[in-house]
Amino acid sequence: MTTPTPLRSVTVNTPPPYTIAIGPGLLHDPPRLAATIRGRHALILSDSEVAPRYAAQLHETLLRARPDLHLNVFTLPAGETSKSLENFGAAIAQLATLGATRDACLFALGGGVIGDLAGFTAACWMRGIDYVQVPTTLLAMVDSSVGGKTAVDIPQGKNMVGAFHPPRAVIADTDTLATLPLRELRAGLSEVIKYGAIRDPVFFHWLQTTREALLARDPAALAQAIARSCEHKADIVGRDPLEKGERVLLNLGHTFGHAIETTQGYSTPGSNNLNHGEAVAVGMVLAARLSNTLGLAPAEDTETLKNLLDAYGLPTVLPSGLTPEMLLERMRLDKKNIAGRLRLVLWRGIGHAEAVPDVDEAAVRQILAN
């Protein structure tokens, strides 16, 4: 008989604190879901891939516990291109039509795109209402749903318009990972690997030895990977909720990755363009190679990281057609930069990341060219 996967809980000690619940069957838990709602209005925001699978279940569960609830569902097309100012306006209009008051709650049912857009919408409606992250992708469970960063994209760059607005709760039903496409599972594992790379060599080694179980979606292995990743993010975010210090280390590979995404065009269902997790995988290898070039990290650790990403089926080289100057143009707009100079998260080897100010563009250009 299969042993049930236990429910795991991680607390994020930001002001205000909130809990990440991780486990199977959480979309069927009326008391847990309803406990997050303070008022009588709620909106479920989802996308065209996730809503047909899970929106009706979430809707039913909420109404079972709160039959008095005024509850609507708003569905957007799947893909990064939906994280736009136009759709932000559409979500605001949905709240207005619902008659949402300041004690309303918005449920973000989907991946990182939906979570970011829903969070930003919640941050702005009546200067801030509650929202609950209900992530259905591995990447959202381990990264974007935790920490309160909310944003939309503009043509000049990714996540350029946003706010810090912590969720009221994160409810990660791991049963939803059963329907996740393999490519999206791998994208989430890229962010999981990042946690080992920046601060946990033991976890990094565990990921080396547990690859087959994770790719086979073993429930216990996935629950452990999600919980450990969330513990790392909660630990950092609890001390640095507004990214004034160490939280920036969570961005290993992201400056390169965001530049890749915005230069090539955002990935959409069926697209060959790199998705976020894939772009971060390439970005981590580029950051590691740059660290080696600058004398910060041993070359063998870079090779170990590249080999692990390769083993998980993730890309580790730049897509063709992206020139160094095209990417640098995007990197110069990165939010982490100071006084117009590149500030990158690099590393000193497995488990040790650091933010490096005033990085020489010539060194970056050389890495991008090779």
Curated annotation (Swiss-Prot):
SS bond list: none
Annotated cofactor note: Binds 1 divalent metal cation per subunit. Can use either Co(2+) or Zn(2+).
Keyword rRNA-binding annotated: no
Residues holding NAD(+): G112, V113, I114, G115, D116, T136, T137, K149, K158, T176, L177, A178, T179
Residues where Zn(2+) binds: E191, H254, H276
Keyword Ribosomal protein in annotation: no
Locations listed in the record: Cytoplasm
UniProt xrefs under CDD domains: DHQS
Pathway: Metabolic intermediate biosynthesis; chorismate biosynthesis; chorismate from D-erythrose 4-phosphate and phosphoenolpyruvate: step 2/7
Entry-linked HAMAP family: DHQ_synthase
UniProt family annotation: Belongs to the sugar phosphate cyclases superfamily. Dehydroquinate synthase family.
Protein role: Catalyzes the conversion of 3-deoxy-D-arabino-heptulosonate 7-phosphate (DAHP) to dehydroquinate (DHQ).
UniProt-recorded name of the protein: 3-dehydroquinate synthase
The species this protein was found in: Xylella fastidiosa (strain Temecula1 / ATCC 700964)
